[in-house]
């Protein structure tokens, strides 16, 4: 689908593997794409028309870059900080497509979101205590009567970074210190740990109404707070889908949200969904690849670009199905060392319809729990077959790592 408007100059706020589909969508729309970021080695920069070195989390520097390069739109990347920067620039320059800056900070800051949900009412999310002073948080931890276990999170990080579980007061204090050390804005939340299954619920909003849905189960193996495997669709989603849509549309009305992706993570317990956090951006781990399969070819990245860069949603499909059984696996090394290769049994390999390797053999893995080597995308005939291979047979795919001497 081509753009029939004059060529737009678009600033894309990163160019990692998760952003490449955004970049390709922009090129499909005949945009002149300028990428930025402080990692010039990222693969997407080579696909852009121009790369300008910079820190996309630096609001004023990115605003100056947008003005200097005379861009017509800013496209957020697959990172919460990128969404915040895009909203900041767009508000100052009068670009359409982004939520306003205050709204963006409400959604993409865990403490702000909890406070908003409490004010709005009718949003089922674990109640949280928030702290911007570490000593105050430690004093609270030493005297709290709350029931353990608890979850401690920096308010401003994503992809599971900085999240820890505390099973007692001493451990809680250690988790609080760690979360403050990791948070850029030096603010954390502490909330009860809910025992249940974790899921994702991705929607696309048009005029503050849900126009498309994608659901999935989230599985973690090596790092309990980083999603490693997603299986589509979510188990028992029929129990909670209508209620989640109601809550999303209630938030969309209250915040006057723009068109585009609205994603949330939730815990399913006793037939009810407890919302953990929300975000307005594409998802990591190349989530949109199997999501496109589930949606019968619906291209989440393309429609996100149209919404966020002011192209509008004309031609949006009248319906987006959830058909079939799809999955991805992020290839996470079991330990640090030198990556040597991957072994996949033939009866599993036959389900792999696409892959994307991020690193090659010889790559030195130094942070294995948060550094995916690549991704496998799979499809299955039945839900049971999918769960058996992706979860029960997780260990049958071997990532070979040579330990450093």
Language-model features and meaning:
Residues 34-37, 146-147, 311-315, 350-364:
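Short amphipathic beta-strand starts and helix->beta connectors
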Residues 163-273, 282:
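Internal nucleotide-binding/catalytic subdomain
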Residues 331-361:
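Glycine-rich active-site loop/lid that clamps phosphate-bearing ligands
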Residues 1-103, 135, 323, 333, ...:
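ATP-binding N-terminal substructure of ATP-dependent carboxylate-amine bond-forming enzymes
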Residues 167-168, 203, 331-334, 376-382:
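Short beta-strand-to-loop capping motifs
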Residues 243-264, 269, 279-336:
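Active-site "cap" helix and flanking loop/linker of ATP-utilizing ligase/carboxylase catalytic domains
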Residues 91-162:
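A conserved helix-loop-beta module that forms one wall/lid of the active-site cleft
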């Amino acid at each position: 689908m081509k753009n029939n408007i004059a060529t737009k100059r678009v600033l894309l706020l990163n160019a990692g593997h998760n952003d490449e589909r955004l970049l390709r969508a922009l090129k499909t729309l005949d945009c002149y794409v300028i990428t930025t970021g402080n990692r010039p080695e990222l693969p997407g920069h080579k696909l852009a028309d121009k790369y300008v070195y910079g820190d996309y989390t630096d609001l004023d520097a990115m605003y100056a870059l947008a003005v200097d390069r005379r861009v017509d739109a800013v496209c957020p990347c697959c990172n919460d900080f990128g969404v915040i920067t895009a909203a900041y620039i767009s508000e100052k320059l009068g670009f359409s497509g982004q939520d306003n800056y205050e709204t963006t900070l409400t959604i993409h800051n865990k403490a702000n979101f909890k406070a908003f949900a409490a004010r709005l009412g009718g949003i089922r999310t674990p109640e949280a205590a928030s702290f911007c002073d570490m000593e105050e948080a430690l004093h609270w931890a030493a005297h709290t009567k709350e029931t353990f276990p608890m979850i401690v999170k920096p308010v401003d990080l994503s992809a599971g970074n900085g999240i820890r579980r505390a099973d007692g007061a001493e451990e809680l204090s250690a988790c609080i210190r760690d979360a403050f050390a990791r948070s850029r804005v030096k603010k954390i939340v502490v909330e009860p740990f809910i025992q249940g299954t974790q899921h994702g619920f991705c929607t696309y909003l048009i005029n503050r109404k849900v126009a498309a849905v994608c659901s999935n189960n989230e599985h973690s193996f090596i790092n309990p707070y980083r999603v490693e495997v997603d299986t589509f669709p979510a188990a028992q989603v029929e129990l909670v889908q209508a209620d989640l849509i109601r809550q999303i549309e209630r938030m969309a009305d209250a915040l006057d949200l723009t068109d585009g992706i609205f994603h949330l993570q939730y815990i399913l317990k006793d037939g009810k969904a407890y919302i953990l956090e929300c975000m307005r951006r594409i998802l990591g781990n190349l989530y949109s690849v199997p999501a496109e399969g589930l949606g019968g070819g619906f291209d989440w990245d393309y429609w996100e670009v149209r919404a966020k860069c002011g192209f509008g949603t004309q031609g949006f499909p009248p319906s987006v199905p959830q058909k079939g059984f799809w999955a991805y696996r992020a290839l996470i090394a079991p330990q640090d060392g030198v990556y040597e290769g991957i072994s996949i049994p033939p009866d599993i390999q036959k389900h792999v319809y696409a892959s994307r390797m991020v690193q090659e053999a010889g790559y030195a893995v130094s942070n294995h729990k948060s550094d995916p080597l690549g991704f496998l995308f799979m499809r299955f005939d039945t839900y049971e077959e999918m769960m058996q291979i992706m979860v029960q047979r997780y260990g049958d795919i071997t990532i070979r790592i040579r330990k450093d001497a």
